[in-house]
Amino acid sequence: MFSNNLCEITILSFGNNWLQKRVSADSVMRKPDFRRFWFSSILAHFGAQITLLALPICAVLMLHATPAQMGTLAAFESLPFLLFGLPSGVLLDRSRRLPVIMCSDLMVAIALASVPLAWWLDMLTIPWLYAVGFVIGAGHVVGGSAEQVFLTFLVGRDGLVDAQAKFAATESAARVVGPGMAGGLVQLLGAPIAILCNVAGFIISLLNLRRIRAREPQPPPSTSHPMRDIQEGLAFVWNQPLLRTLAWVSACWHLLFYGYTALHVLFATRVLGMTPGTMGMANMLGGLGVLAASLLVKPLSRRLGTGGGILVGLCVSAFGFALVPAIPTALFGSATWTVAAYAIVVFWIDCGATLFFVPYIALRQRVTPDAVLGRMVATMRALTVAAAPLGALLAGGLGEGFGVRAGLGCIAAGAVLLAAGGVFGTRLKEAKE
């Protein structure tokens, strides 16, 4: 779930005829159902910015979580990918995807709504947040895989790169505007109440998804045992050298990213002294990295091939990870310069992640037949995010034992090694399609 079309929307006053000409020239945007699906993605990305800030802020500032507890929270959020990733692929290949997406979104909305309720009842605890994080992760496992497969159904394989670029533009807009909005809401209302805004977004999104008219054909009933289907998904990925390479590279990236996720709020608040408001502002500026990447991803894929674009993303994100532990507490003796440095770091990490994942998703779906597409997506998600709980727990342990900055330093070293391994140890640069 990641474009100039967002810019078009903001300048409608220049003439509806001009916009209609642009839309008519865009085969993806001519599809009303894609536009509805994209709108729900916009709501999801903006709402996610609130939760990404508010949930860890609840843990760090309200419940005084330790680095180990933050690592455990991040691990619980990613654990469902390991537990449910493979079975979800069987479910997707046996079910229509849109109802699965809607059920997953409803489950996440209920979990999020429990946070302000528990806070109001004075029952909010770290274990409660563990449970909420686990439910949110479970919803994302099934719903996220279903969204990728349903998008392929809506636009076809030929429209995937263009559609993914538009989703990247959505994320870029959310990453530029959303964090500032989220930081302001958390600062003004408190983290639990701010989460309610995301719940409202889920409700609107569900109502919008009900308006999608395209109906997937019901997959033929399967007489095989679910375990056999899981084995077929694993075998398909394993027997495709390209998918196998993508799986281990993405698994290593997720291990590092979830380690960073476990520690970055602690680092920003307790080491750098940032408030939720300044964190939101820094992340808002850093979100320009996603915007830059969404504009670069198609030219890079044309020039370097899809695999080359993936490698560029690895290197750019590694550069961002390497900068994190180098941020001083008071750069040039000023907290303002420290916030600016933090924003620059987020810029590079987000830019690299987008440059990596847009061609990564498009490439793996191009080489997969429809019959196993759901199992492939779920298998890849399960394999690649399986390392995430380990990364979060390791980072939390390193932060607890040696300090948050030292833990982030280990993540930086791992990111540099991964980028070098991707460039010199794989044949991704040869993947042109």
What are these regions (language model features)?
Residues 2-433:
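Alpha-helical transmembrane-bundle signature of multi-pass membrane transport and export proteins
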